[in-house]
């Protein structure tokens, strides 16, 4: 079979698939479940979440999500939390382990307003070696609850 015919058949198959998919009630893809995640490198988490979002993913926080894991809130419109959710926040640190205040302030400015306000009302971000935990019950007033 020539490449031209193969390409034509492939194109026709895609068109038929798209038409069939459009006429059916397609189920929503399952959300990515976040639980028992202690975080890691900010850049790694940011790139991972950005790729998931580009693919149309949504997120369900159903357990602990600490440190860099909380970057998922930058896409709060795609996030829901259960009563089992707990988010752990802290200030960022530089390569020497010292507080990175300006970077922490910048990250705080990116979180949704209700989350920023809650953290500020409860003493602000703790130092990098501490953690402020926000429970599922409190989170459900700050981030969309899961259905």
Regions found by a protein language model. Give the residues of each.
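Cleft-lining beta-strand/loop regions that shape enzyme active-site pockets
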Residues: 26-93
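Charged, glycine-interspersed solvent-exposed loop segments at helix/strand-loop junctions
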Residues: 31-34, 43, 47-58, 97-147
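Signal peptide processing junction and immediate N-terminal pro/mature segment
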Residues: 21-23
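Bacterial N-terminal signal peptides that target proteins for export
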Residues: 1-9
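Compositionally biased, proline/threonine/alanine/serine-rich low-complexity intrinsically disordered stretches
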Residues: 25-26, 147
């Amino acid at each position: 079979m020539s490449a031209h015919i193969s390409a034509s058949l492939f194109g026709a198959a895609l068109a038929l698939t798209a038409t069939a998919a459009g006429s059916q009630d397609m189920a929503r893809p399952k959300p990515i479940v976040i639980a028992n995640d202690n975080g890691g490198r900010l850049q790694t988490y940011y790139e991972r979440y950005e790729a998931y979002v580009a693919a149309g993913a949504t997120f369900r926080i159903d357990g602990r999500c600490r440190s860099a894991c909380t970057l998922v809130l930058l896409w709060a419109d795609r996030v829901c939390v259960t009563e089992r959710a707990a988010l752990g926040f802290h200030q960022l640190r530089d390569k020497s382990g010292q507080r990175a205040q300006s970077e922490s302030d910048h990250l705080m400015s990116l979180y949704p307003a209700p989350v920023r306000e809650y953290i500020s009302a409860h003493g602000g971000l703790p130092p990098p070696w501490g953690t402020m935990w926000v429970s599922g019950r409190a989170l459900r007033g700050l981030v969309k609850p899961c259905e």
